[in-house]
């Protein structure tokens, strides 16, 4: 077994800290999604709680990225994690003391506060990877990083469902706070052993943001990758918003948690594979096949009202995701100078994750007010669709997932015609040889 470098050991410590923290937030997100849907009976509200926990952090990510290039990145990670407890405390206060008229607003406010502080973590963590590792370690580390979002959907939704069945949502939120308190000393250990890599600059924050945007936009290959990120995030946001309404229609809360966990094991399998086997060539082909696999799996996931098939295709969907993310992450990382990666990752996070915002804000309402009334009509077209995908509650959400999957397949088939990504691939191969 090859000996791990000192930088990779530090990366693993930060990775463990991030994994623990993300697992706790995954429990809270799952529990709050169930709580909001059961409270209101609307997919729109499920999307709204996800949006509240996502949008503030997204909007602040460019500023957080610029800060990551100016200040101690590990300190910013500690501040982001630690201060996010304020938002969780706000949610706990709302659940305990607010009446039904104010409860939803209090929960949304708490989710937004937690999201705002958490925005400090992501760009600092991504930029720290480049501080710690050599270029030939990037894809292996990227495979490990893919496991972090997977942890949100592995055993922890099942655990959250179990806690909800024997206790209350308060217990889930307290467990989330506990995971944050565990991660802080781990990050501090790494910070203590590292010298700050930030450099003082005379440029102001506005100039930093402009420079970050120019770095991304002027390179057409990078810009195309960011646009692909928008598409992928929209499809994932669609799944996250509509999975609960769709699965609750033919399974209970326990099945929703079980199916979510099985699906996320696909991401775990993909991430573990990439952590062992580095991608060194054929990046465009890997990206195309990954997007194609995701699209086909999304279509099949929404098509069937069969618990076994839903779990199988959910697994396949998330199995493909780490390969797409790793290719995009690596090509971006190898192209942008390390000194500018904080601001660049902050802006890339803002732009590429616009797809999540669009999905969280629109797909629930689109299903509730457009697709559902359409399927309830007696027209020939709606009846044909129902004959294909089945009838019953939750099929409107399933149809929206199928539509998103079809769009992803079309994009994957068009991708090989884009030479800009192949140019990034050629540069990355030259870098590895060097």
Regions found by a protein language model. Give the residues of each.
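Juxtamembrane intracellular "pre-TM" segments in multi-pass secondary transporters
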Residues: 1-11, 192-227
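Primarily residues marking transmembrane-helix entry/exit sites
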Residues: 7-15, 43, 100, 104-108, ...
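Membrane-helix interface/capping residues of multi-pass secondary transporters
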Residues: 11, 43, 73, 104, ...
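Substrate-agnostic recognition of the 12-TM MFS/MFS-like secondary transporter fold
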Residues: 12-29, 50-68, 72-85, 106-165, ...
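Small-residue hotspots at the loop-to-helix junctions and early N-terminal turns
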Residues: 28-31, 35, 40-47, 143, ...
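MFS-fold secondary transporters
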Residues: 37, 90-98, 114, 186-187, ...
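Helix-loop junctions on the cytosolic side of multi-pass membrane transporters
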Residues: 127, 131, 173-203, 278-280, ...
């Amino acid at each position: 077994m090859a000996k791990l470098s000192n930088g990779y050991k530090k990366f693993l410590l930060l990775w463990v800290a991030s994994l623990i923290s993300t697992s706790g937030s995954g429990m809270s997100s799952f529990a709050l999604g169930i709580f909001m849907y059961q409270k209101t009976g609307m997919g729109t509200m499920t999307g709204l709680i996800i949006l509240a926990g996502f949008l503030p952090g997204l909007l602040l990510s460019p500023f957080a990225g610029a800060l990551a290039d100016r200040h101690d990145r590990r300190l910013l990670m500690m501040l982001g994690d630690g201060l996010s407890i304020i938002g969780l405390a706000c949610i706990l206060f709302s659940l305990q003391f607010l009446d039904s008229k104010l409860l939803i607003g209090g929960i949304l406010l708490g989710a937004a506060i937690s999201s705002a502080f958490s925005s400090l973590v992501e760009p600092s963590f991504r930029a720290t990877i480049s501080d710690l590792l050599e270029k030939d370690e990037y894809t292996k580390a990227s495979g490990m990083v893919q496991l972090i979002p997977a942890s949100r959907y592995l055993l922890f939704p099942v655990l959250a469902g179990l806690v909800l069945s024997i206790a209350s949502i308060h217990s889930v939120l307290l467990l989330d706070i506990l995971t944050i308190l565990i991660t802080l000393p781990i990050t501090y250990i790494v910070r203590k052993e590292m010298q700050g890599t930030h450099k003082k600059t005379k440029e102001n924050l506005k100039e930093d943001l402009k420079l970050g945007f120019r770095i991304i936009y002027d390179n057409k290959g990078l810009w195309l990758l960011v646009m692909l990120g928008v598409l992928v995030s929209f499809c994932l946001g669609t799944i996250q918003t509509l999975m609960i309404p769709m699965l609750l229609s033919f399974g209970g809360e326990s099945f929703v948690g079980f199916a979510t966990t099985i699906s996320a094991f696909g991401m775990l399998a993909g991430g573990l594979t990439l952590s062992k086997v580095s991608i060194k060539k054929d990046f465009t082909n890997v990206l195309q096949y990954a997007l194609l696999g995701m699209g086909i799996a999304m279509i099949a996931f929404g098509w069937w009202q069969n618990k076994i098939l839903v779990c199988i295709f959910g697994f396949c969907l998330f199995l493909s995701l780490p390969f797409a993310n790793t290719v995009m992450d690596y090509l971006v990382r190898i192209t942008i100078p390390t000194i500018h990666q904080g601001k660049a990752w902050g802006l890339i996070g803002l732009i590429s994750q616009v797809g999540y915002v669009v999905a969280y804000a629109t797909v629930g309402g689109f299903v509730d007010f457009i697709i559902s009334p359409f399927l309830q009509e007696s027209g020939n077209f709606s009846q044909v669709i129902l004959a294909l995908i089945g009838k019953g509650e939750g099929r409107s959400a399933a149809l929206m997932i199928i539509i998103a999957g079809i769009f992803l397949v079309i994009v994957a088939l068009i991708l090989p015609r884009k030479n800009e990504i192949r140019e990034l691939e050629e540069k990355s191969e030259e870098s590895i040889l060097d």
